[in-house]
Amino acid sequence: MAMTYHLDVVSAEQQMFSGLVEKIQVTGSEGELGIYPGHAPLLTAIKPGMIRIVKQHGHEEFIYLSGGILEVQPGSVTVLADTAIRGQDLDEARALEAKRKAEEHIKSSHGDVDYAQASAELAKAIAKLRVIELTKKAM
């Protein structure tokens, strides 16, 4: 039987996931993180993107995170997300429209702050589309 640990994914609105998992993948402030059982304690910021949850028996779930904090402790991991949305709850048409608007905003941006904001919005839209794509494949 595969080793597991307890994972909680919570946002300000609700608890998104609570249960035993084999591993997770998430984007931290320093890059991609793979958290397996026995991982060293860690506290890091999470960048906007997705969390890939591999539950017991290899079943996968994908959740979009707008950012937050990841805490790894012996035997448990907690994700405190600013906003968290399950892949099946994301609206593909809205994500595509947000991507299009962000790309237009980048083209017409004036100044570093404007460009940085548009780039962040584009990254969020692309992350949502990726979560939608992976959720469809996992079903």
Curated annotation (Swiss-Prot):
> Assembly state and interactors?
F-type ATPases have 2 components, CF(1) - the catalytic core - and CF(0) - the membrane proton channel. CF(1) has five subunits: alpha(3), beta(3), gamma(1), delta(1), epsilon(1). CF(0) has three main subunits: a, b and c.
Q: Which residues form a coiled coil?
A: none
Q: Which domain of life is it from?
A: Bacteria
Presence of the UniProt keyword Transport in the record: yes
| SUPFAM superfamilies referenced in this protein's UniProt entry, alphabetically | Epsilon subunit of F1F0-ATP synthase C-terminal domain, Epsilon subunit of F1F0-ATP synthase N-terminal domain
The reply on keyword Cell membrane is yes
Say where the protein is mainly found: membrane
Question: What does this chain do?
Answer: Produces ATP from ADP in the presence of a proton gradient across the membrane.
Pfam families per the record? Answer: ATP-synt_DE (PF00401), ATP-synt_DE_N (PF02823)
Kindly provide the name given to this protein in its UniProt entry: ATP synthase epsilon chain
